[in-house]
């Protein structure tokens, strides 16, 4: 008997597979062998499909011997032709009611099976209006032009497929609607459908083509399968419709699990497998439910799952499978459940694509249908999505259709067999969907990381606020580097390092610098500026590279016992100077690189620390310890911290500098107001063309003279500590005279004009204090220190509620996270937070819009857009004629600078000369309320920029709130 035994291998998804393949071939225009033309437009098609779907085309094509004939359809509109093609290839088509009559007429003339009365399967009145069925009348939405003639009415096997229901679409009819066993959940389904209809419709509209392509084919196969199952299929479809769309086996096969089961026992096992697959998919969906792409599917699936659970009453088996699937579906909520359901209906091809299309129409129809369907007893009707009609109520099925569609379009080639339905397809879909979801989640996570790194960075260390300086760096100043190096270095964390290393450091010239660049030379409250200097110093180590010899050795800077301040570079107009610590540098040593004393920058001040320095570094991250964690005595720390902690101690500023070479020699001053206007000189590492002539020449002269410049920036402990000014050699002085813009040590020579820098989020201002060089060397330090003391770099451990001039702008997030609402000068402005990859939005800083390329910050997104368009990555084309170091790519910015900023500085310089002269040309810093320290710059002459006799220094001062 074993020899006589035969095994029947049944391909449950055979029809849907073939159909989906045709659809895919059509979409890709693969193996097309004929062309249909209407209204001057062409559609390529396959002779086999046309012949199978239309006796007219079959006869016509038999008479044609051309390899690729072209048929011009005279009285057919292109839109109708396309709809008929969709119908033939996908088994269904969505069309508005006003176009239905014309389509049916054209289909009649072309003898399209399923749309014309001449089909062997027996005809249903082509006009839905004529049909007495309630559904036909009620359907105002897209119609599924498949004749839903019940399998029984449909002359059953008479369909061209005759014996095999799967045989042809002409007999396409949704399983007889036993009428909804009444999807007990029809109301719920309706609700789901209603809620989902808009989304589904939108999705359907977008995917309608795809859906139509794959869904029609799948539907026809499914329908035939269902038809074969006959009334059972009808009941199952109704039950499935109650479960509704769990299977989303497009076309009436919704509950085809049952129909499939009824159709063949093999189908049942398949459906069982599908169910398991569906469950798996459901789990995947649960994971993926979060993805928006699945949202529509999720809604549908959820509805389906509910429908499945509730509507399953129709068929026990379906309920079992549906419930099993439905449970997961409901749990997952996304299409996977639907997919699983469709998989469950193994015999029935899950026509998810068709379902999707139907979804949009059937969602509406659902509402209508629930009423009409329940009342409709007649089996023959051209139903809107007739195959789904029952299912249509279950819009959920359509969700699966979407999924299936996606599969068909993208993966059909790879998994042609399973794309449409059946367990295989559902499994494939689930897997695909899962992957997609994970990808999306991953992307979202990445986005979040990109958006939030600042916050994280700021919060890494309990006691410190790390500031990534974006457009400004505290200017290191003649001021004492007073902070004990221990604290800064200790507090510094690697987190910034990682940030920096990730972001910008290519070679960490002195990786240790990062850890302890903060090496503060001496503790001094005034070191706030020093702190800035320290950060810069670390950079300068890099700058030292410019000087030339950075030895990546961590050895402390031993070249000079006295601290030297060297201009490392500038950010915007912010001049960055670095202090080369004296032997304190042992701590500095961690920072550093051996370089010329002048270039060597190992400075840790005020808890500011550079993560690393490298010749190729384009970004330096400055860490500022949180003043809260530090004693107020550490004014430097606090001062710096104030910047960081102004708003939560977690400011994250990106300080992007050109190569150390340019750091050292750029002579650009900073004006907070013009950050947006100024061009960051760091775009090119070493280009002299970016520097003023003086700066460029000084660049070379400085290297030779740096060593000669030894100024002791000895920080006297306490605010009263005396500061040694940098002593300039005669040669250096000569150079300064010749090169007005060069900073010797920390002092900016560019102009004697005082420069006031307002740091928006920081209770401090940076000003240029110009004093005679004589004063620099011999100036009583008390003058500079006292102001610092008064200003109290401490600034109350916490960022003061800075009420600086720039702080009049307040903003708050609106309920809609896509926008922010800003109120400035009693004016409200709403700004979209959507931005391109070149932009970073950081709500923690006053100027939240950051250029990802150069880290400049802007208050308004439009300003950043202009920057990206006109400035970013381009060398400046316009330079200030007054040699103040201002450079920009935008002519209007230069004009405004000359008319406002530069002129105002001259006036301020003139005004300050008098007070300054009274004080003996000693730099004086005056504490100003509102948490900002406004230094009074005593600029001696050189209003015209001829600062040959004077050198200017920048002091970063933080004022105590209490002050």
From Swiss-Prot:
Major localization class: nucleus
Q: Which UniProt keywords apply?
A: Developmental protein, Differentiation, DNA-binding, Metal-binding, Neurogenesis, Nucleus, Repeat, Transcription, Transcription regulation, Zinc, Zinc-finger
Residue ranges annotated for the BTB domain, each copy included: 32-97
- Looking at the record, which segments are called Disordered? 115-200, 228-340, 447-469, 482-520, 900-963
Instruction: Describe, by residue range, where the zinc fingers (C2H2-type) fall in the chain.
Output: 849-871, 878-901
Q: Where in the cell is it found?
A: Nucleus
> What Gene Ontology terms for biological process does this UniProt record contain?
axon guidance; axon midline choice point recognition; axonogenesis; dendrite morphogenesis; gonad development; larval lymph gland hemopoiesis; larval somatic muscle development; nurse cell apoptotic process
* Ranges of compositional bias, category Low complexity: 162-175, 228-251, 263-293, 329-340, 937-953
* Name of protein: Longitudinals lacking protein, isoforms J/P/Q/S/Z
**Source organism of this protein record:** Drosophila melanogaster
């Amino acid at each position: 008997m074993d020899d006589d035994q035969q095994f029947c291998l049944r391909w449950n998804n055979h029809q849907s597979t073939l159909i989906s393949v045709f659809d895919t071939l059509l979409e890709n225009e693969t193996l097309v062998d004929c062309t249909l033309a209407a209204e001057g437009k062409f559609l390529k098609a396959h002779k086999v499909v046309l012949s199978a779907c239309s006796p007219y085309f079959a006869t016509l094509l038999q008479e044609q011997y051309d390899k690729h004939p072209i048929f011009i359809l005279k009285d057919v509109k292109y839109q109708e032709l396309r709809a008929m093609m969709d119908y033939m290839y996908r088994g269904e088509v969505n069309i508005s009611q006003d176009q239905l009559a014309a389509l049916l007429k054209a289909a009649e003339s072309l003898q399209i099976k399923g749309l014309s009365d001449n089909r062997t399967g027996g005809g249903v009145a082509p006009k839905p209006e004529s049909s007495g069925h309630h559904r036909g009348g009620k359907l105002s939405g897209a119609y599924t032009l498949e004749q839903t003639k019940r399998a029984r009415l449909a002359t059953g096997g008479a369909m061209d497929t005759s014996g095999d229901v799967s045989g042809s679409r002409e007999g396409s009819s949704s399983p007889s609607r036993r009428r909804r066993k009444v999807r007990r959940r029809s109301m719920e389904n309706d609700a789901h459908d209603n809620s989902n209809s808009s989304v589904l419709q939108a999705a359907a509209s977008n995917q309608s083509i795809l859906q139509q392509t794959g869904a029609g084919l799948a539907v026809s196969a499914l329908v035939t399968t269902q038809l074969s199952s006959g009334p059972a299929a009808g009941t199952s479809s109704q039950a499935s419709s109650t479960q509704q769309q769990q299977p989303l086996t497009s076309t009436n096969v919704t509950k085809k699990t049952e129909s499939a089961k009824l159709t063949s026992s093999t189908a049942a096992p398949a459906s069982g497998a599908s169910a398991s697959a569906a469950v798996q998919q459901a789990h995947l969906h649960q994971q993926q439910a979060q993805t928006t792409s699945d949202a529509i599917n999720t809604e549908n699936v959820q509805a389906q799952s509910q429908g499945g659970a509730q509507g399953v009453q129709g068929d026990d088996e379906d309920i079992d499978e549906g419930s099993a699937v439905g449970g997961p579906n409901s749990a997952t909520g996304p299409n996977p459940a639907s997919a699983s359901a469709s998989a469950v209906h193994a015999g029935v091809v899950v026509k998810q694509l068709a379902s999707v299309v139907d979804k949009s129409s059937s969602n509406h129809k659902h509402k209508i249908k629930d009423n009409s369907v329940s009342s409709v007893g007649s089996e023959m009707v051209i139903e809107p999505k007739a195959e789904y009609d029952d299912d249509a109520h279950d819009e959920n099925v359509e969700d699966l259709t979407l999924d299936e569609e996606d599969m068909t379009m993208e993966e059909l080639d790879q998994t042609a067999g399973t794309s449409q339905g059946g367990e295989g397809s559902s499994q494939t879909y689930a897997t695909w969907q899962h992957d997609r979801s994970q990808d999306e989640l991953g992307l979202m996570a990445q986005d979040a990381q990109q958006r939030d790194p600042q916050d994280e960075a700021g919060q890494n260390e309990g006691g410190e606020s790390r500031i990534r300086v974006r457009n400004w760096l505290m200017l290191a100043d003649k001021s004492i580097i007073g902070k004990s190096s221990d604290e800064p270095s200790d507090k510094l964390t690697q987190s910034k390092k990682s940030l920096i290393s990730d972001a910008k450091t290519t070679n960490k010239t002195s990786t240790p610098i990062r850890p302890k660049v903060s090496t503060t030379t001496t503790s001094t409250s005034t070191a706030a500026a020093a702190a800035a200097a320290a950060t810069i110093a670390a950079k300068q180590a890099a700058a030292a590279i410019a000087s030339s010899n950075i030895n990546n050795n961590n050895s402390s800077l031993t070249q000079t016992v006295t601290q030297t301040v060297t201009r490392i570079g500038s950010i915007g107009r912010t001049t960055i100077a670095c202090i080369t610590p004296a032997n304190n540098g042992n701590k500095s040593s961690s920072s550093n690189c051996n370089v010329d004393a002048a270039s060597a920058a190992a400075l840790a001040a005020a808890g500011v620390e550079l993560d690393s320095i490298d010749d190729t570094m384009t970004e330096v991250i400055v860490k500022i310890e949180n003043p809260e964690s530090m004693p107020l005595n550490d004014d430097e720390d606090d001062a710096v911290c104030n910047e960081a902690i102004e708003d939560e101690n977690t400011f994250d500023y990106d300080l992007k500098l050109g190569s150390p070479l340019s750091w050292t020699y750029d002579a650009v001053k900073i004006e907070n107001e013009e950050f947006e206007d100024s061009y960051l000189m760091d775009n090119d590492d070493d280009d002299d063309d970016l520097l003023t002539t003086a700066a460029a020449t000084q660049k070379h002269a400085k290297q030779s003279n740096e060593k000669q410049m030894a100024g002791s920036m000895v920080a006297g402990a306490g605010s009263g500590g005396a500061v040694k000014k940098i002593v300039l050699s005669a040669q250096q002085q000569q150079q300064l005279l010749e090169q007005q813009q060069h900073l010797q040590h920390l002092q900016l020579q560019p102009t004697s004009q005082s420069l006031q820098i307002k740091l928006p989020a920081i209770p401090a201002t940076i000003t240029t204090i110009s004093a005679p060089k004589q004063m620099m060397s011999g100036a009583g330090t008390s003058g500079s220190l006292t102001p610092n003391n008064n200003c109290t770099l401490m600034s109350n451990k916490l960022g003061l509620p800075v009420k600086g001039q720039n702080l009049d702008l307040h903003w708050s997030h609106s309920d809609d996270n896509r926008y922010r609402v800003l109120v400035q000068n009693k004016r409200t402005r709403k700004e979209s937070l959507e931005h391109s990859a070149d932009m970073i939005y950081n709500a923690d800083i006053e100027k939240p819009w950051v250029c990802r390329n150069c880290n400049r910050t802007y208050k308004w997104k439009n300003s950043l857009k202009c920057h990206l368009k006109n400035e970013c990555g381009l060398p400046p084309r316009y330079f200030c004629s007054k040699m103040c170091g201002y450079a920009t790519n935008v002519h209007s910015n230069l004009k405004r600078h000359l008319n406002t900023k530069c002129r105002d500085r001259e006036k301020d310089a003139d005004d300050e000369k008098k007070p300054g002269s009274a004080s003996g040309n000693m730099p004086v810093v005056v504490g100003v309320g509102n948490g900002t320290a406004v230094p009074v710059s005593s600029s001696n002459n050189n209003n015209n920029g001829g600062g040959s006799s004077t050198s200017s220094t920048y002091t970063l001062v933080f004022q105590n709130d209490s002050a």
